């Protein structure tokens, strides 16, 4: 079976994958960035989607916060129109522009947690935003390198997940990501 990791340019709220990942904060507040966009697209009402997310967090984890590597799954609601079956919330590290081995390990946990949950749910395709590269301030190049490394290893052992997408909204970020993994100006995957 062919497996693939692909970097694409687009809007994750309109991306066609069985699961999309939300780069959430530890309390699932969905107050800004991609978390706000996903909540708005899923429900139309961010506060309602936040309420649903918090209820699911308490039900699934038995607490009111997520640690690095933990995930919460919520229904896709309106995102179902794009073929989305699940929204998987994970928490990446806050960098504030400073990258370290500790931040890398926390990001690996966040990515791997979402991938494992998707595999457990029988998902074949999953789309990620650049976790921690936005308002959390981690360098995009480091985030992309970490994604590539984690996904490459995970796809060797995955039972169901066959397609992993890193969806970048801006053309600038998309081009930088392709350059980072040595693809230049094309959209091939490695």
From Swiss-Prot:
Tell me where in this chain the Macro domain is found: 1-185
Q: Which Pfam families does the entry mention?
A: Macro (PF01661)
The source's superkingdom equals Archaea
Quote the InterPro entries the UniProt record gives: Macro_dom, Macro_dom-like
Q: What is this protein called?
A: Uncharacterized protein PH1513
Q: Which organism is it from?
A: Pyrococcus horikoshii (strain ATCC 700860 / DSM 12428 / JCM 9974 / NBRC 100139 / OT-3)
Q: What high-level taxonomic lineage is stated for the organism?
A: Archaea, Methanobacteriati, Methanobacteriota, Thermococci, Thermococcales
């Amino acid at each position: 079976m062919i497996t693939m990791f692909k970097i694409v340019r687009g809007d994750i709220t309109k991306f066609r994958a069985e699961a999309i990942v939300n780069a959430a904060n530890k309390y699932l507040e969905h107050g800004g960035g991609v978390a706000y966009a996903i909540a708005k697209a899923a429900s139309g009402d961010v506060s309602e989607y936040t309420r649903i997310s918090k209820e699911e967090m308490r039900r699934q984890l038995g607490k009111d916060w997520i640690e690095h590597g933990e995930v919460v799954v919520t229904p896709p609601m309106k995102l179902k129109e794009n073929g989305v079956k699940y929204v998987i919330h994970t928490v990446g590290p806050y960098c504030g522009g400073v990258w370290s081995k500790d931040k890398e390990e926390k990001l690996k946990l966040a990515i791997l947690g979402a991938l494992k949950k998707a595999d457990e749910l029988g998902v074949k395709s999953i789309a990620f935003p650049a976790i921690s590269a936005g308002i959390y301030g981690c360098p995009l190049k480091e985030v992309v390198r970490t994604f590539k490394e984690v996904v490459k290893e995970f796809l060797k052992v995955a039972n169901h997940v066959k397609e992993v997408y890193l969806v970048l909204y801006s053309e600038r970020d998309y081009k930088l990501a392709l350059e980072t993994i040595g693809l230049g100006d094309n959209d091939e995957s490695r």
